[in-house]
Amino acid sequence: MSLTANCSFDLSVSDDFVGKRSGYIHIGDSTNNSGWALHSVPITSVKNGKGPRVLVLSGNHGDEYEGQTASLDLARRLEVEDVKGEILIIPVLSILASAAGTRLWPDGTNFNRVFPGKVDGTIAEKLAYFLSHDLFPTCDSVIDQHSGGRSMHFIPSITMVWVSNVELRNEMLRQSLMCKSEFTILGGEQPSTNPDSLLPGDVVRQGKAVATGEFGGSGVTTAQSMAVISSSLENYLRGMGVYVGKDVAASVYADSIDHPGKIIDSRDYSVSFASASADGIYENRVDLHQQVQAGDLVGLIHDFKSADNKVIEVRARRSGIVALVRGYSPVTTGDVVCMIGELFPSIEAFEKSLEEKSAR
């Protein structure tokens, strides 16, 4: 249990408790302007007796506003009669980064790389410790909503890491598909990164399912991205049995797509990612949803300092659908500028492909 962070209302009420409460996760701080200070993160609980407890998270990175907007809207409109069990909502995890319009906290912390946190660490580490030790163990499931932020732009979609635990993987896949998004992107672990240091990785380490999504990017909300994330969140909560209210968002989005449940397989990052090989100004030469072949031109890097130097071409390393493009033009060497995956019309088609490959 954390000794340096606490909730302003009781999180351990009885199963029969009924009520809607809003408050803060308070984290002890001391600054130049306030010797005795609290860093306060908003949290809302809507509980209606016995049932699952589901934790809704967003704002893990400050410049990913789609999830923050959807979660704030959910926290405002949820009433007790909409819920069976408890929905906990932390809409803006990284408040300082969100206010600054940056991915990272002002001190340079990437909140999605500090788990399981430290009880006596920085503010970010204390918050991560509270989540990892006080909240995650008490929840039946967690949804962590992301987007590409300022630097990237995804097809608004549910995403899922292909974890090694088969039983947990199947449950995560089930939860991902219950969101009824048009696209679910399957990926591997991020290269050169400790998966347990990520918020979703810490949930998985504890043997619990986590749902995630990349709902757009470029540091903006769009009508499409908000439709996808709002309906996916509503469908997820309904599928978990904790939301029993009206279809506020899901029915609107359902009318705008031809077929939910398409799968984009980008698990092999060695060929799915295209990266900048030099510093410069990046020009996208493909759009989201576009089909490309291995070797196709996906982007150009222009030299900042000279119009005489030739542009550097960035080419696809595999065939498939473009699932991510660059959202912010300046790039440095190694920045991911495009992601391509193999498109399947359904989970059944994807699973059939896996069976065929394993039989070879």
Describe the role of every protein-language-model region.
Residues 1-360:
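Structured catalytic-domain cores with a bias toward divalent-metal coordination
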